[in-house]
Amino acid sequence: MSIKEQTVAKFPVEPFRIKVVEPIRQTTRAEREKVLQVAGYNLFGVRAENIYIDLMTDSGTAAMSDSQWAGIMLGDESYAGCRNFFNLEEAINSITGFRYFVPTHQGRAAENVLFTCTVEPGQSVPSNMHFDTTQANVITRGGDPVNLLAEKGLDPTSHAPFKGDIDVERLEAFIRQTGPENIPLGMLTVTNNAGGGQPVSMANIRATGEVLHRYDIPFFLDACRYAENAYFIKLREPGYAETPVVEIAREMFSYTDGCTMSAKKDALVNIGGFLAMNDEALYRRACQELIVREGFPTYGGLAGYDLEAIAIGLNEVLDENYLRYRIRSTEYLADKVYAAGVPIVRPAGGHAVYLDAKALLPHIPAEQYPAQALAVELYRNGGVRGVEIGSVMFGKPQPDGSEIPAAMELVRLAIPRRTYTQSHID
């Protein structure tokens, strides 16, 4: 065993037992080559039955708990006023403190409703780093999604503890240059999915809120992975080591005016999301949009049993035994990959390991999409499906036919929650 291999810590013990299983099968390289050709080398076009280890996303791929499945049997499918809505309302209020919320079928629908209610053509929405659906929803409304990630977050080799932080000085300079009247809201994505799953510090959340509120600009979190971010704060930020994660989460939300959330991440379910806020006028507008796009405000495109599963999952995810396992098991894969000599974003994020395709494949220029090439090779050689987070996803086409490449060329290996064991990871 090499010195590098000896430094890799053991895989954490899973804090759960497995009750239901789903068969998967290994394919041959020849089979996978044919699959790739049929799919046009687009991994989104590959049928799930042809994937051995599917690390494309952690969204909606979690294994639900026995409590969540039991809750599904309590689904109240009344069109209006189902009891599951009020159970979810209680869960959201107890964790976030927000007074109002509307359920949606997933996170991008919550973004759609929010930006439809707030963004006018020509306005800008600053963030640490918008993910692709958030960016697309802002652009669809005629707005400009602006990324102001701190410089440390753009260096895959940096070991800074909070590489998801926004550059607060640049944020204030941007507000002054653009004009507060042209910024309907500001956002932070926690954790920063487009930038390596890196967390945002409490100090940065607080400072961002102070800057935005100084100019009367509402502040929203993209809270898909709020529990993972809260646990990183507990691990890495001075003063929080003894603070329960639920209290850290409440403090995170206390500096903001609302949030969007895909419940398919840190609510441990397969479908669902919500938009929450304190502004009653915004809530009323959101309800009107919801009825047109999603459904009545007490179901929002979801069955009652889905609402119940989300309510249970929002609290389950705050179990520190689970979070310890979740963060450490991701770090375990990162350590293994790094020990094998593959450049990755360091330190490991909460939900995924990000391979640095730009460093691994320096001979492939950005305009030939090195991260997409690497993702295809991972599937071709091992049957593992990841996803490109680079110029295919975030490149900006120009009128002259050229393209501004993404800041980083990454392949994300997102680990579904409570789904794979150490044998799969190894």
Please tell me what each predicted stretch does.
Residues 317, 393-426:
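PLP-dependent enzyme catalytic core of the Aspartate aminotransferase-like
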